[in-house]
A protein has these predicted regions:
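A short amphipathic helical element positioned immediately N-terminal to and/or at the very start
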Residues: 33-41, 109, 218-230
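Hydrophobic faces of transmembrane alpha-helices in multi-pass small-molecule transporters and flippases
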Residues: 47-51, 86-94, 124, 236-244
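Alpha-helical transmembrane segments of multi-pass membrane proteins
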Residues: 79-88, 269-280, 309-319
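Short, membrane-interfacial amphipathic segments enriched in basic
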Residues: 197-222
């Protein structure tokens, strides 16, 4: 019991330190006068619409987790699914290339009784649905507005095309794992043999066999889980619909900012598709939250649309898409740490360890 108290004390200290660091980070990054001025200049109804878009983004991502876990036979209630979503968003926002979210999501689901293998398969399925929605909107947006992009600055277009290509390749890899696992294993084997053929590896006597075996195990496990999880076609349709709704909601924030500053004349779908393309281009930058590329890309893509409100609208957009997610996600991190169910499970383990065991000698 004393050990648990010490652990709780350190957890509380860590949470307080993290809260202070997060507050300092936000204070350093944002100009408070600009923030106040920006929101004071906006129409309240569009501020509410902007917040509503982000809430829809969170809720429909959570619904997607709920449907996917149902299809795998390990259903999560909505609140657990929302916690999984927000933990992923928070840790992705604070790590390079958004790489930190998935491990914490797998850990969270594992705590709820879902095996690590199944949790990984759930994450991959959710990831695939998001990529389908994102790539579909990206291809459509690029087909319609490639001329607008060229007019906004030719230097930006190669990054956007590369970002779209990488998203397509990522989607293709996940799809191959699900539909044609042997193809992906064959391609992966060729790539790994090529990588391990580099002098850096050969000089150390490293062989690709271990990496190839790990790839085979992962792909085969995911394919098995996919076959099981894809039996319920209705849940697949629901999950895919949720992915499109959350993607469109997230990509509508720039339009809410546009209308909030009293601007009109640009159709909704144009502003929305340009935000999709901005997301694809900025995703190449490995900084947390694609910092720098997101702001710079916004200023470049929208400079012909937002006029004198460009800087303020960018600030509002960034506050919603990044800092709001950071704040809400952190609240879920704290709530998850303080969840009474965690304490109950810890007490159960403690009581189980204190139960008297029979003494074989006495018997």
């Amino acid at each position: 019991m004393a050990t648990d108290k010490r652990k709780n004390k350190w957890v509380a200290i860590i949470l307080i330190v993290c809260t202070v660091l997060l507050a300092l980070y936000v204070m350093m990054e944002l100009d408070h006068e600009q923030v106040v001025t920006a929101f004071a200049s906006m129409k309240p109804v569009w501020i509410l619409a902007l917040i509503g878009c982000m809430l829809l983004y969170y809720v429909f991502d959570a619904l997607k987790y709920m449907f996917v876990t149902q299809s795998f036979g390990c259903p999560q209630p909505f609140w657990d699914s929302l916690t999984t979503t927000m933990l992923g968003f928070f840790y992705s926002a604070v790590t390079p290339l958004a790489s930190g979210g998935q491990p914490f999501q797998i850990y969270h689901m594992h705590k709820k009784g879902i095996s690590a293998g199944t949790s990984t398969s759930v994450i991959c399925m959710v990831y695939m649905y998001w990529k389908i929605a994102l790539v579909s909107l990206g291809i459509l947006g690029f087909a319609i507005y490639s001329r607008v992009l060229l007019d906004s600055g030719a230097a930006w277009v190669p990054f956007l095309m590369l970002g779209l290509l990488l998203q397509i390749l990522a989607l293709g890899a996940v799809a191959l794992s699900a539909l044609k696992p042997q193809w992906l294993i064959a391609i992966g084997t060729i790539v790994l043999k090529g990588i391990f053929g580099v002098e850096l590896f050969t000089s150390r006597g490293l062989e690709p066999s271990h990496a190839i075996n790990k790839l085979k195990r992962f792909v085969e496990e995911y394919h098995t889980a996919y076959v099981e999880g894809s039996k319920n076609k209705k849940l697949i349709v629901y999950s895919l619909a949720c992915a499109f709704v959350e993607c469109i909601a997230y990509m509508s924030v720039a339009y809410c900012s546009y209308r909030g500053f009293g601007m009109s004349g640009q159709p909704y779908y144009r502003v929305m598709f340009l935000q999709v393309l901005l997301y694809l281009g900025a995703s190449l930058v490995p900084t947390p939250g694609a910092a720098g590329a997101s702001e710079g890309g916004y200023m470049m893509i929208y400079r012909g649309l937002f006029g004198r409100h460009l800087t303020m609208s960018m600030l509002v957009w960034r506050l919603a898409t990044y800092y709001m997610t950071l704040l809400v996600g952190y609240l879920f991190v704290v709530a998850d740490r303080m969840d009474p169910r965690r304490k109950r499970r810890r007490k159960e383990r403690h009581h189980a360890s204190e139960e008297p065991h029979s003494d074989p000698v006495a018997e």
